[in-house]
Regions:
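Phosphate-binding chemistry for phosphorylated carbohydrates and sugar-nucleotides
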Residues: 1-4, 8-190, 203
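Phosphate-binding and adjacent anionic-ligand microenvironments
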Residues: 71, 111-301
Length: 301
């Protein structure tokens, strides 16, 4: 029952990491035709960063199109994070994956519980969680905060922007292979390739444009920003008035229309991560530009 005839072709990309042979073999046992890339001895010779995001998933995107596969399933080096590619070779973001997995757990498996996300997560996950009757808990960036919440009980699923998705009934930790298997089963149950599932999701819950920029600063500038940020309360950004200002982890501004901006200095290096979500690429980029200016101290507050 795990795969209908139409969706028996998948590209699996373990990125030369721990999922080599595992995910591909599990799917083959279920009758899926699998093309595994970045695996076996050849993978040692390839220059790849085992991070399931663009540009590192480009090879997988090409393989999906060449094979006429219904999806590409990507796991990072230690197989706890997931990325995906749809049948059109389009990169599917972890938020979209988490939203699909959540929908599957509630609608097909009749499970319930809280949904735990980092504050850098897309509002898409919150919108679908609320529509499905799940309460949402927001934590700082880092899966350890989500895992701690899972251990308290009552949690269905937890996920982070970087692609870590954990299902509490399985274990309070991320599992990229499990997330891939659930995606596969969902394609079989709905008889739809991945891109169609994502389009349906966005038709129902709204389409947004999400982005992140990593800004490298001088060490002392990063330290200054870390010190000053808790006191920053902008009255408006890009002509929008923040409805909610959070200093839980960096500075997060949420606007009335569900768009938002997060400026978050790294705890380990002189890098500031700027995240934003808008209803168009232009709006998202305008917010990202403002966030970068804010981090550099050049935004007029």
């Amino acid at each position: 029952s795990a795969a209908s005839d139409v969706y028996k072709r998948q590209v699996v990309d373990p990125m030369g990491g721990a999922a080599q042979g595992y995910l591909a073999d599990l799917l083959r046992e279920l009758g899926v035709e699998v093309h595994e890339i970045h695996a076996g001895q050849a993978s040692d010779q390839e220059d790849i960063c085992p991070d399931p995001v663009e540009p590192w998933v480009d090879t997988c995107e090409r393989a999906v199109i060449e094979d006429g596969a219904c999806a590409g399933l990507v796991t990072d080096g230690d197989a706890d994070r997931i990325g995906a590619v749809d049948e059109r070779g389009r990169y599917i973001h972890p938020h979209q994956i988490m939203a699909l997995v959540l929908g599957d757990l509630v609608q097909f498996r009749n499970l319930e519980g809280r949904v735990v996300v980092n504050l850098s997560c897309s509002t898409l996950v919150r919108r679908i969680a609320e529509a499905l009757g799940c309460r949402v808990t927001v934590k700082p960036v880092g899966f350890k905060y989500i895992a701690a919440e899972m251990k308290k009980g009552g949690v269905l699923i937890g996920g982070e922007e970087a692609g870590g998705i954990g299902i509490a009934a399985h274990m309070p930790e991320r599992d990229g292979i499990l997330a891939c298997l659930i995606l596969c089963e969902l394609m079989a149950k709905t008889d739809a390739p991945l891109g169609v599932l994502v389009d349906q999701l966005e038709d129902s819950f709204g389409k947004t444009s999400y982005g992140r920029r990593d800004l490298r600063l001088e060490a002392e500038d990063a330290e200054t920003l870390r010190t000053l940020l808790p006191g920053v309360n902008p009255k408006s950004i890009c002509g929008k008035v923040p409805q909610n200002v959070s200093h839980m982890d960096g500075l997060r501004l949420a606007f009335e229309d569900d768009t938002w901006l997060l400026v978050r200095p790294s705890g380990t290096e002189p890098v500031v991560r700027v995240y934003a979500e808008g209803f168009s690429v232009e709006e998202r980029d305008e917010l990202l530009d403002a966030g970068c200016a804010l981090a550099r101290g050049t935004y007029p507050l």
